Swiss-Prot record:
Protein's gene: DTHD1
Organism phylogeny: Eukaryota, Metazoa, Chordata, Craniata, Vertebrata
GO biological process: signal transduction
Domain Death: 679-764
Span of domain ZU5: 167-301, 302-483
Pfam families the record matches: Death
Source taxon at top rank: Eukaryota
The organism of origin for this protein: Homo sapiens
InterPro entries: DEATH-like_dom_sf, Death_dom, ZU5_dom
SUPFAM superfamilies per record: DEATH domain (SSF47986)
Protein name: Death domain-containing protein 1
Amino acid sequence: MHDECTPQQTMSSIQDTKAADIAARGELNVIETATVSPTNGEESHYTNQVQLEKNKTHMSSALVEKENNTSLNGRVLGQEESQNKMFPDNAENEDDKQIEHMTVENINGNREETHGIIQTTETEIQETSESPREEMTTSSIICDISKKYINSTLPNDSENIKHKNNIMEKEYLDVLSDVTGPQVSCYITAPSYVLQQLECRIINHMSSLIVGDNEELVSNVITIECSDKEKRVPFPIGIAIPFTARYRGNYRDIMVKVCDINLQSSYLNPNSLEGMKGGYKGTCASVKVYKLGIFSVVSCLKKESFTVTKKGLALKSSMDSRISLNYPPGVFTSPVLVQLKIQPVDPALVAHLKAQQDTFYSVQSTSPLIHIQHPSTYPFQKPVTLFLPCSPYLDKNNLGSEIDHKRRASATINRITPSYFNRTKIASIRKPRKNASECLKLLGFRSQDSGWCGLDDVVKTIQSGLVSVELYEHLERFIVLHLSSTMDNSHLVTFVKSLEEAMLSTTACIVLSHQKDNPHRIAVLVVPSKDLSQVLKDLHLEGFGGPPEPSRHFQVREGEQLLLRFTGNIFASSNGKDYGKDYTLIFHLQRKPRLELQIKEVDEFGNYSCPHYKGTIVVYKVPKGKIVPNLNQSLVINENHSQLPICKLPLKLPKHKKLINRPQSTKRVSKDPVEALWDNLLHWLAEELSEENAESLSSTLPLRRSTIQLIKLKNPDDLTEQIHEFLCFWKKSLPTFTDKLRLLARHLRKIGRSDLAEELKFKWENKVFTEPQQCFDVAPE
């Protein structure tokens, strides 16, 4: 759990100092503000005032002594304000930093008095870390700086002087893939010379490791780095990140999450949610940052912080007026900071869990899940009373609204799939009735006890739908269950664990669609079940559609990664070049995870018995433990797929017609007059036969079907050539001394063409050559 803290403020004001007794002999007085880096790895800034004296002729020790004894009419005032909000458990502290810019005024050496003028700029710095650090204050010291240090520092500082007022805003673009165009990654407001050194990249492949429990990613994940590692960035700089939040409510808030290279995170509260930024018309989360790293915008549970003093506190939650807390006087021995989060429970989830297991039947309803944080070093001296809403039965109206897939004000999500909704409805909607055995049960989570436990006799009913809870010890989170009859504590703990897991999960499915104009292009999406119909309509408008049907429904958590493996005779590529890879989809509820791929067959001669190529997309869940983070490329996934796939999608690809480029046909004409006559007669006969006659003749002649198919394939558009080919093939298959004319005449009579048989006999006997309609190239034997 991380804190959002307001930046600490450190101000320094330095009044002008007038050197009254220094003669104007070309001396130059410079008062400079320098930043010295601390040792031991701690980040702290010290403001050093350095008085430099430079004489044109010489600098003597006597002059230094004279100047030190000079009465200065002025003073240096330093004020520091620091507010530290800290949990002893979390050990989250704030470091104060101060960066001051200097201005050097040229002094005329011809005048007798020299005035040094310093202009200081106050800045604010806040840094929240995961490890405890000692708070370091800003101090002012006076020291001597060697000539070497001056020569190396002054050019840098002069550059800062030159550009300190040249604040600009730059739009950073990045290209996610070869298919999509560039999109806005962020806007950075900083001095122009700094903007030239900053680089911004979109690293959405890291989102699995960025998002946490009860968080929903609503923007790209970006990383901002400085190309010149030795360049000092004048923090703070402004960053605006575009985001799109579809679901907002009283219980959720928009925060900017900042992670370092080790994925240690902190949160920043946006100072504005702008509707317009440059050419981008969407919404941007604007923050001031004091370090570079990995940035993202997340929707998380809203945190409410308040301080409980020795006098106690009575507070009504701003998120839900039905929830209030009463800390009696003396509950703590000293003031402590308390943080509260409220997570509403969807009645449909309770109904679904009851339908899944009969042991949960006694659960009628629940209160919201309360996350509360107290310092463990301050135990309760007196019981703390909380008032929570807890309806005595599941609200039929609330359940109906979830059926219609409408977003509740609490920003909960309908995760009930249509396949089991009927059973859920029957198991959940019952008439409310009074039962003497009805009871209320409090279940709390204590980290030191490693889990949930049941607490007895701490819940009381105030009025219908409202209960009071007395806490005698620290609980990280708790929930009140309204039971129709008593249940064993082990069953209650199992129910709460299942409910907590269901609140972190969403029912979703995989949608696979082919582009209608180009079946080799597919779109693969992970879609929440409640959005399925709308997504299918949108795909249809984009020109995608067709089989297969969406996959079966499964449970997936925010940021969970799905591995898509192509098997069978079809593989895919994201750029049309590299085929045979596996691809990943990262599920984010408020974003639209989508892959557009090019597919083709592995073996063009495969699936020969089918009119299309066949393959399968096998989908696996990838646990976070198997993901190796890498900023520069996609996440490396360990190849141990011991678990079963969550779903499979059949993939089909129509076979394309093969264009065979054949050379021009040539016929060998024999010089033997008998063979030449036979060839002429067979060609004449092929021209005289119709398609029906040819089919009948081919069936009567002793020819194999494969031979006829091969002849048709060679000449698909010329019937005469087909008939001539199989007649020649039949003639060659006969023995040499066979009476071919008599056999052919017999087959012609069988198909009812006795006229052609008689004319064939006449032409053979009289050696009549018929002029062919098509000329052939003659190849020498």
